Regions:
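Conserved small/polar residues in nucleotide/adenosyl-binding loops
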Residues: 1-5
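Short, contiguous clusters of charged residues that form electrostatic/catalytic patches at enzyme active sites
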Residues: 6, 55, 59, 138-142, ...
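Generic non-transmembrane alpha-helical segments
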Residues: 6-7, 37, 105-109
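Short, flexible coil/linker segments at domain boundaries that flank nucleotide/cofactor-interacting
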Residues: 8-14, 150-155
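Gly/Ala-rich phosphate-binding loop of Rossmann-like dinucleotide-binding domains
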Residues: 9, 39, 176
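Residue-level marker of positions within ordered structural domains that often coincide
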Residues: 9, 24, 62, 107, ...
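Ferredoxin-reductase
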Residues: 12-90
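Gly/Ser/Thr-enriched, mixed-charge loops and adjacent short helices
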Residues: 82-184
Length: 184
């Protein structure tokens, strides 16, 4: 029984999963491998073409009305670590019960090297793997801009400390679009 049947089809007959990745070593390649496995199982995958922040994944899952989301990250852990975080259709991390069920399924896999995964480019050609629409990123940016009007009104100085993380490009775009030239 595959992940689609065990977990995703319980949530939606035609499941869609959004996958994002951060700036860590091999995160993009890891995201593509997960996309290959899910798409091979018949899951529609929406894959970011470039690194994204975790809040962007949560937003994209809700915006696209996806069944689930996968974030390739090790969060605050050392840079040589990597891992995945799974999100539900509400854009939040899985609740303990759902997380435990998925963990049991994964732990029951006898030989991970025998998991079937078709060619990435073929799956893209067949549109089983699609790119994250730019409209989703633009909607996210607009949502953030709508929330930060108070900062703009008070001409506050902004200090951005993404520490080489994924939020730097989008945060800089948002601040520039809001007319901030007084940020570090």
């Amino acid at each position: 029984m595959c992940i689609r049947d065990r977990y995703l089809k319980q949530k939606n007959e035609h499941p869609t999963v959004v996958i994002h990745f951060d700036t860590r070593f091999l995160s993009q390649e890891f995201s593509q491998e997960i996309a290959r496995v899910l798409a091979t199982e018949g899951v529609s995958v929406v894959l970011a073409d470039t690194y994204k922040s975790t809040p962007e994944l949560s937003f994209a899952v809700r915006e696209l009305k996806a069944t689930a989301g996968v974030m390739i990250t090790a969060s605050h852990n050392p840079s040589h670590y990597n891992g995945i975080k799974i999100y539900g259709a509400d854009g939040g991390q899985l609740l303990p019960e759902a997380s435990e069920d998925l963990s049991q399924y994964i732990n029951a896999i006898e030989s991970p090297l025998e998991i079937e995964a078709r060619d990435f480019n073929s799956l893209k050609t067949e549109k089983l793997i699609t790119s994250l629409p730019t409209e989703v990123t633009e909607a996210y940016k607009q949502g953030v801009k709508d929330l930060v009007g108070v900062i703009e009104e008070n001409n506050a100085r902004v200090v951005l400390t993404s520490l080489h993380g994924t939020s730097l490009p989008i945060a800089a775009d948002i601040l520039t679009e809001l007319g901030f030239d007084n940020y570090v």
